[in-house]
Regions:
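ATP/nucleotide-binding catalytic cores
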Residues: 1-168
């Protein structure tokens, strides 16, 4: 699948109001590069294990030591969730905790009832608790194909052909 097709699918799913989009990939940076293109003026926030609750664009923490549960608590009303895209990374280990699953389900239900928001889970490990299964749409991001790899290698060689090699 080419990036254009993946991106087009992601846009369609967001526009259609799919509450939770689970992007199964090892390439978090590739997903990050697409988000600004598809956010349609919505505020984008991220939660990850390392930095907590952060502004997606600047990658600066919005709160010190903000746990996933605390972030979810802050978005539990429609007016606080509206016009947002929430990116969750490093949360698969939390998806066996009933309190977390319940809060994620609450977000999904609000989105299903018309709140203009999307939850995007980015992970290389597919973990979907039964309680939120019906709200989740899985989107696979394929790896580079042979032609894409050749293009990257040619570009690298072209860019570096005239540079001196330091042999020390």
């Amino acid at each position: 699948m080419e990036d254009r097709t993946f991106k087009a699918k992601l846009v369609r799913y967001i526009d259609a109001g799919f509450p939770i989009i689970y992007i199964n990939t090892f390439e978090e940076d590739k997903v990050d590069s697409l988000i600004p293109e598809i956010s349609s003026g919505k505020e984008v926030y991220e939660w990850n294990e390392t930095n907590g609750y952060i502004d997606f664009e600047t990658k600066t923490p919005l709160q010190e030591d903000c746990t996933l549960e605390r972030m979810l608590d802050q978005l539990k009303t429609p007016d606080l969730l509206d016009r947002k895209i929430l990116i969750f990374k490093d949360i698969t280990s939390y998806l066996d905790e009933p309190r977390i699953v319940s809060k994620v389900k609450g977000l999904a239900r609000m989105i299903n009832q018309g709140v203009d928001a999307t939850v995007i889970i980015v992970s290389s490990v597919l973990v979907i608790p039964k309680d939120i299964e019906k709200y989740v749409t899985i989107l696979e991001m394929d790896y580079l194909n042979t032609d894409e790899i050749k293009t990257i290698i040619r570009g690298f060689v072209k860019d570096n052909l005239n540079q001196q090699v330091d042999e020390n």
